[in-house]
């Protein structure tokens, strides 16, 4: 069975490598350098398991820039292209997904298309009506950037947005490649599957925002935030997870998914969803004000990446802090090894860590790290538990 993956980011690659253990997989991408790396068994993204599997496992996997080669004769086409949130329209930009669908319909109209990209609630059914097609359904992904393949090898659940034989066969592909057995698998309608994805991520954002507000309260009143969080989380109904204070929720998924869900609530009474989005802005204001209260001459930003083990800093929360500090006229320098540019938003990138430490009189870091241990007195962080 030939499976095509359109898009070789975290979602596309992790699904492709998972399935390529047992089936032919062809990955399509428009970036020639990424395709070349993949065909040399090298990962274009930082992900321990993806790197390991490409280098050491027997995979029936190749990549191409040729859409005709990729889509021809494929049984399933997994669509994993980016859907950025457009603040002007209050809607995901689904143009890349729609472009793939048009190409597949033109080249291989019998292929079953599976959307893995995050999309608005109701999008799949709207597409079916608009294009007059039925060979498509949505299946959300639940993964962490930097651990994408691990999360597909050990999934918490599989959700398939269709009840049919072809949906069952697709679920079997994911189950077959996983290390974990007896995976909870849920078959729903596509619209319900779309809602599951957005509500799951919005709940995670809610939890981040909750513990951040607890931490803001503790810092404002001079209380020990760690003791409070530990005491609260010993209640098994709350649990000791996803509770580490931060500069706000960030990254590619949570900010855009919460805003999209809020937009989907346009005609539905709500309070909590809007409050989550507002709380994240308030947290960034609070953090920036706390840093500025120390009257720094130069603020050093240690790492722009969203989390450890990732090379991605799309919409990382520390960027919001950085912009607020710069808006008050305080110079900002950046230490970020994965950057090739010399500037980021008009702030200088310092490549030498020692020089960076010497030049900054306050260093802000979303998480404490051993690299900063020798200048701990300069470091401002709200991370308490050494985890993302």
Curated annotation (Swiss-Prot):
Gene3D superfamilies tied to this protein: N-(1-d-carboxylethyl)-l-norvaline Dehydrogenase, domain 2 (1.10.1040.10), NAD(P)-binding Rossmann-like Domain (3.40.50.720)
Family: Belongs to the UDP-glucose/GDP-mannose dehydrogenase family.
Originating organism: Escherichia coli O111:H-
PANTHER family given in the database record: UDP-GLUCOSE 6-DEHYDROGENASE, UDP-GLUCOSE 6-DEHYDROGENASE TUAD
InterPro entries linked to this entry: 6-PGluconate_DH-like_C_sf, 6PGD_dom2, NAD(P)-bd_dom_sf, UDP-Glc/GDP-Man, UDP-Glc/GDP-Man_DH_C, UDP-Glc/GDP-Man_DH_C_sf, UDP-Glc/GDP-Man_DH_dimer, UDP-Glc/GDP-Man_DH_N
Residues annotated to bind substrate: 141-145, 197, 201, 242-246, 250, 307
Pathway assignment: Nucleotide-sugar biosynthesis; UDP-alpha-D-glucuronate biosynthesis; UDP-alpha-D-glucuronate from UDP-alpha-D-glucose: step 1/1; Bacterial outer membrane biogenesis; lipopolysaccharide biosynthesis
Free-text description of this protein's post-translational modifications in UniProt: Phosphorylated on a tyrosine residue. It results in a significant increase of the dehydrogenase activity.
UniProt GO molecular function: NAD binding; UDP-glucose 6-dehydrogenase activity
A GO BP annotation: UDP-glucuronate biosynthetic process
EC numbers for this chain: 1.1.1.22
Active site: 253 (nucleophile)
SMART domains on file: UDPG_MGDP_dh_C
Family annotation (Pfam families): UDPG_MGDP_dh, UDPG_MGDP_dh_C, UDPG_MGDP_dh_N
Superkingdom per UniProt: Bacteria
Record-listed NAD(+) binding positions: 2-19, 29, 34, 83, 118, 145, 252, 256, 314
Catalysed reaction, written as an equation: UDP-alpha-D-glucose + 2 NAD(+) + H2O = UDP-alpha-D-glucuronate + 2 NADH + 3 H(+)
UniProt keyword list: NAD, Oxidoreductase, Phosphoprotein
Protein name from the UniProt record: UDP-glucose 6-dehydrogenase
């Amino acid at each position: 069975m030939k499976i095509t993956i359109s898009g070789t980011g975290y979602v596309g690659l992790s699904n492709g490598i998972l399935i390529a253990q047992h089936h032919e997989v062809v990955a399509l991408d428009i970036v020639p350098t990424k395709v070349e790396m993949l065909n040399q068994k090298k990962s274009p993204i930082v992900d321990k398991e993806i790197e390991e599997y490409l280098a050491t496992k027997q995979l029936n996997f190749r990549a191409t820039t040729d859409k005709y080669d990729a889509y021809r004769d494929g049984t399933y086409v997994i669509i994993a292209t980016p859907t950025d949130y457009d603040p002007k329209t209050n809607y995901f930009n689904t143009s890349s997904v729609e472009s793939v669908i048009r190409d597949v319909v033109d080249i291989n109209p019998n292929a079953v298309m599976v959307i893995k990209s995050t999309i608005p609630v109701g999008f799949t059914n709207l597409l079916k009506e608009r294009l007059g097609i039925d060979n498509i359904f949505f299946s959300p992904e639940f993964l962490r950037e930097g651990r994408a393949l691990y999360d597909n090898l050990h999934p918490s659940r599989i959700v398939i947005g269709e009840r049919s034989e072809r949906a069952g066969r697709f679920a079997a592909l994911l189950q077959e490649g996983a290390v974990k057995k007896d995976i909870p698998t849920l078959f729903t309608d596509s619209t319900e599957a779309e809602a599951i994805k957005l509500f799951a991520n919005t709940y995670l954002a809610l939890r981040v925002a909750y513990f951040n507000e607890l931490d803001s309260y503790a810092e404002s009143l001079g209380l020990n935030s760690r003791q409070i969080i530990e005491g609260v989380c010993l209640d098994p109904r709350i649990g000791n997870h996803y509770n580490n204070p931060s500069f706000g929720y960030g990254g590619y998924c949570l900010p855009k998914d919460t805003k999209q869900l809020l937009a989907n609530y346009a005609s539905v009474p709500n309070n909590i969803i809007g409050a989550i989005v507002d709380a994240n802005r308030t947290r960034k204001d609070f953090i920036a004000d706390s840093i500025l209260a120390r009257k720094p001459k130069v603020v050093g930003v240690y790492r722009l990446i969203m989390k450890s083990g990732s090379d991605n800093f799309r919409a990382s929360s520390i960027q919001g802090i950085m912009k607020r500090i710069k808006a008050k006229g305080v110079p900002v320098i950046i230490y970020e090894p994965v950057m090739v540019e010399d500037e980021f938003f008009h702030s200088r990138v310092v490549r030498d860590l020692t020089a960076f430490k010497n030049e900054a009189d306050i260093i802000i870091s979303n998480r404490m790290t051993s690299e900063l241990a020798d200048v701990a007195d300069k470091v401002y962080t709200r991370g308490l538990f050494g985890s993302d």
